[in-house]
Amino acid sequence: MKKWFPAFLFLSLSGGNDALAGWHNVMFYAFNDYLTTNAGNVKVIDQPQLYIPWNTGSATATYYSCSGPEFASGVYFQEYLAWMVVPKHVYTNEGFNIFLDVQSKYGWSMENENDKDFYFFVNGYEWDTWTNNGARICFYPGNMKQLNNKFNDLVFRVLLPVDLPKGHYNFPVRYIRGIQHHYYDLWQDHYKMPYDQIKQLPATNTLMLSFDNVGGCQPSTQVLNIDHGSIVIDRANGNIASQTLSIYCDVPVSVKISLLRNTPPIYNNNKFSVGLGNGWDSIISLDGVEQSEEILRWYTAGSKTVKIESRLYGEEGKRKPGELSGSMTMVLSFP
């Protein structure tokens, strides 16, 4: 005779992986460097080198996030991530802009390369360091730590604007340099601070780059006003006005002229044009060709000119009388 025993299954479900989730205590310790580099006399075609070293020393906590205990109880793990976050371009107080191009990152992992404004360099070490004690494992901003690990320097090329005026310059390169110290309770439960969070940390390190620009190119003016004047609307379509810009260079160089519209056009006619309002566009030409880019070359010191021409365009039924205005930006750069 068989006897049946009732069987009961109890199942408890929780959202996500909460049952397996561990805790994380994360601190960021920042260095506070002030370095100077004097590149001497340079020309805009030169690309002086910029070294950002990794020096050991005392660092101060500038960030913390602790989801775990303040003091350990039993086994826990540790890991470290060295961070360098360096701007891709730097402005002076006068509004001039230089770009930093990576020349050497040996020993570093360069990550999040699509960021428009910053380079991110990471170096991890002492992964999953096993520890069993009752030490303090959550520290607040202001706590100081001696950091003695050594890493390779970062080397950059400094790209100068082709139209940088002659004179002495000081470019402050402010960057983030520090260590992310991570405590956690589950083996291999690694954590890296998000890039958007890292780049918001205080840039406590400065490298002051100084140099004297002794050669380059200068446009004859910073503003050109192409004025069509007062026109009868029936005769406005196709009206042409122009201005000529002179550029003087005293170094052998190729200069790319690029036009960028500030006011979008009304019509899509596959030409570079600028919107003027009231149903009108301005179709732009450079040296008689409907284009938005041109390259000029200098082999000896001297001036060259570029003619910027505006041709009014408006379609029947859309164009209206009134004041017309629009703008564009001309950029001088190396090809």
UniProtKB/Swiss-Prot annotation:
Q: Report the domain of life of the source organism.
A: Bacteria
Q: Could you confirm whether the keyword Transmembrane appears in this record?
A: no
Pfam family, any one: PapG_C
GO molecular function per UniProt: carbohydrate binding
The UniProt entry, under SUPFAM superfamilies, shows:
Bacterial adhesins
The scientific name of the source species is: Escherichia coli
UniProt-recorded name of the protein? Fimbrial adhesin PapGI
Tell where it localizes: Secreted; Fimbrium
